[in-house]
Amino acid sequence: IRARKCTYFTTLNPIMNNMSGFRGMYLEQCLKNVKENAPTRFGLFVNLDWEQIDAPDFLENNLTILREAKTAGAIGLKVYKGLGLTDTDSSGKRIAVNDPRLDPIWAACGALGFPVLIHSAEPASFWKPKDKFNERWLELKQKPGRYRDPAKVPSFESIIAEQHDIFRKNPGTTFINAHMGWMANDLDRMGAHLDTYPNVMTEIGAVLAELGRQPRRARKFFEDYQDRILFGKDSYKVSEYYTYFRVLETHDEYFDYYRKRHAHWKMYGLGLPDSILKKLYYKNALRILPSIDASLFPKE
């Protein structure tokens, strides 16, 4: 069964999306490369430079970038975690996710039909003391730069609240809340979040381990919100995909996550039905990214 469905995934997903299309000449070269070599196989998201927010022509320039990117073939806007966390203005002040100077950009994305894939903050554990009660203590030991000192950076909850504020203020814009908004450990909260913001989708990149340790609750979540979830992954490493397939598609029990620095628990399969897997793997993406060539995918 696993082998059949893994093949099923690859044949139904002939598209890869590059979230780092950048902008300007770099985006132009990326789009040119795609059009000349594999015009139907890649989607490119544009990126903006928030740290130019104080420039007199910041808004005009970025609205132009979005319009031209859309015309040239880009399919969305990707917002990296630096916004709200490390990006600063010309005076060194942190730029909040919901900085009102950015409001016209979110609105423009809605008008253009440009989904906004937004990654805000980090796992909440990165703000917590590095002790035996922190599930990601080993990761923070091995990668100390991931620790977020509450005395030096805004709290996890404050950054997340800023993100949710732009969802609220822009109901006409489709947002994809990356990494399940770091709420995969609390699916009741995640469900309430999706109920509150009907313009928000989410994706499962980097949170598989949280889903795999609560298979019954996670399966119920996928059943309830099957039209709101996308398949996502931070990096393209083929060997890691099989753990995703195993969690999503099988009823296997008590197996390891693919990394050793965190997720020190066993994983369990959700055994999702084909009807949900198809939505997760491609149907939901086709709905919110209509420029993707739907003829590459089965109709059923």
Report each predicted region and the residues it spans.
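An N-terminally biased module of ancient metal coordination in phosphate/nucleic-acid-related enzymes
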Residues: 1-40, 60, 284
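Hydrophobic faces of well-ordered beta-strands that scaffold small-molecule active sites
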Residues: 8-11, 42-47, 77-79, 116-118, ...
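Active-site environment of divalent metal-dependent phosphoester hydrolases
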Residues: 17-18, 51-53, 84-86, 122-127, ...
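A conditional alpha-helix N-cap/helix-loop micro-motif detector
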Residues: 23-24, 55-59, 95-99, 155-159, ...
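H/E-rich (His + Asp/Glu) clusters that bind or coordinate divalent metals
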Residues: 151, 157-300
